[in-house]
Every structure is written in structure tokens, then in C-alpha cells.
């Protein structure tokens, strides 16, 4: 839930990136997906709560949940499966829409892979597997939408070298890379 592939990290990374998108379509995609990620965070948190709320002390001790319980009882606290607490060090907004969208694309694939791993563990528990399947499907849709946003930005740039400059910071131009680099 709180690793770089987690919902809280993804939500925190996507939401501020929409401000540097150079066109309205891309900004809207990031805003829409960021809003949806908030709902997904609630779903994952609800699953965690439902799995832990009625644990007995014996179950807590046998399952290795003791250290978590000592710090948080059965409160939902964002941390990785390995126990690393959430922090904001693993993600950022670069302010370059191409860079940020590629990072979003990668995050969606990492989330899909995480859901694949979860489904291997909980495949026989439909109360968990069904919402995880839904979330996995949404990651695929998000990946496609981020790809559309990336294409919309690249189509507005110099097709010969759209890495010549940062489209959210440098003056937009349709000139060659050499001309873009010589601006005064």
C-alpha cells in the first residue's frame, strides 16, 4: 500500500503532475486518474481493515503481525508488505511532462505486477481476489490513458526530437532541435 507501487505513493505523485502538463487533455487525464487513485486507496485500506480488525492475539503472534500491532494495533497504517513505512522519497514530479508520464506508465505496470502477485496469494479468497482483479484492470486502463496523454503531448512537439527541451518550461516551438537550443 505504501511502496513506490502503492496507492498512496501513486496518488501523491500523479496529482501534482497535472499542473505541468502542456495541454488540457493530458492535464485532465492526470486529474481523472489521480481522483480515481484516491478511491482505490480507500478500497485497499478497507481490505486491510477487514482482514485485520478481528485478529486474536494468537493470530497476531503466529502470523508475524506482532511488530505492526505494537505500533498501530489494527489501525490501517501505510507501509510496504515488508514493513517499510510510507514516505515520499520514492517519487517526485520532475516538471517535464514526458518524464512524468513515462514514470506514470511505469508505476501503472508496477502496480499491475503487484496485483498479479497478490492474486497468486489470495486466488481462493473471492472477497479479496475480486476487488484486486478490479483494481488490476483499472491499472491497465490507466496505462492506456497515460499513453494517450503522452502521445498527445509528443504530437504537439517537434517530431524529429521531442526530447530537445522541456515542453512545460521552455518556449514551445516547432523548429528543429538546433534552433530550439539556440533561443535567446
Locations of regions flagged by a protein language model:
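Non-heme di-metal
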Residues: 1-184
Amino acid at each position: 500500500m505504501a511502496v513506490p507501487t502503492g496507492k498512496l505513493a501513486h496518488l501523491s505523485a500523479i496529482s501534482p503532475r497535472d499542473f505541468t502538463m502542456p495541454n488540457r487533455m493530458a492535464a485532465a487525464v492526470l486529474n481523472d486518474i489521480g481522483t480515481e487513485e484516491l478511491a482505490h486507496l480507500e478500497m485497499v485500506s478497507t481490505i486491510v481493515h477487514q482482514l485485520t480488525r478481528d485478529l486474536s492475539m494468537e493470530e497476531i503472534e503466529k502470523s508475524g503481525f506482532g511488530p505492526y500491532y505494537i505500533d498501530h494495533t489494527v489501525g490501517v497504517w501505510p507501509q510496504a508488505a515488508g514493513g517499510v513505512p510510507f514516505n515520499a522519497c520514492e517519487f517526485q514530479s520532475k516538471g517535464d511532462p514526458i518524464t512524468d508520464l513515462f514514470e506514470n506508465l511505469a508505476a501503472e505496470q508496477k502496480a499491475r505486477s503487484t496485483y498479479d502477485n497478490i492474486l497468486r496469494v489470495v486466488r481462493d479468497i473471492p472477497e479479496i481476489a475480486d476487488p484486486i482483479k478490479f483494481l488490476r484492470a483499472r491499472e491497465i486502463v490507466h496505462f492506456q490513458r497515460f499513453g494517450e496523454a503522452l502521445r498527445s503531448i509528443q504530437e504537439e512537439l517537434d517530431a524529429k526530437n521531442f526530447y530537445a527541451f522541456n515542453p512545460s518550461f521552455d518556449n514551445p516551438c516547432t523548429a528543429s532541435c538546433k534552433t530550439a537550443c539556440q533561443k535567446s
